[in-house]
Curated annotation (Swiss-Prot):
GO terms for molecular function: sodium channel inhibitor activity; toxin activity. Disulfide bonds join 75-90, 89-110. Keywords: Disulfide bond, Ion channel impairing toxin, Knottin, Secreted, Signal, Toxin. It comes from Cyriopagopus hainanus (Chinese bird spider). Probable ion channel inhibitor. This is U11-theraphotoxin-Hhn1n.
């Protein structure tokens, strides 16, 4: 019975001592992995930041090339009444006096050329 107790005690002591060593090794491995993960995340973050800055630069270049005066101002579409003195018909449309409808209103309309 004594040999069983001694054997059990010996196995228990070995398990505890080896378990502690494994626990320390596991802790060190986890620290190394988290440090590597942080460096990888920092690298990925910097790469994403560079790509976003490049995209922003391209967008700002396109905005600077486009002038505010180059855009067409608001215009009047086809079949919409317009003022005789201020024709703002859209491109491809001309201001004409209507043939049938609109003669009662004495106004001009925008029509296709």
């Amino acid at each position: 019975m004594n040999t069983v107790r001694v054997t059990f005690l010996l196995v228990f002591v070995l398990a505890v001592s080896l378990g502690q060593a494994d626990k320390d090794e596991n802790r060190m491995e986890m620290q190394e992995k988290t440090e590597q993960g942080k460096s990888y995340l920092d690298f990925a973050e910097n790469l994403l930041l560079q790509k976003l800055e490049e995209l922003e630069a391209k967008l700002l270049e396109e905005d600077s090339e486009e002038s505010r005066n180059s855009r067409q101002k608001r215009c009047i579409g086809e079949g919409v009444p317009c003022d005789e003195n201020d024709p703002r018909c859209c491109s491809g449309l001309v201001r004409l006096k209507p043939t049938l409808h609109g003669i009662w209103y004495k106004s001009y309309y925008c029509y296709k050329k």
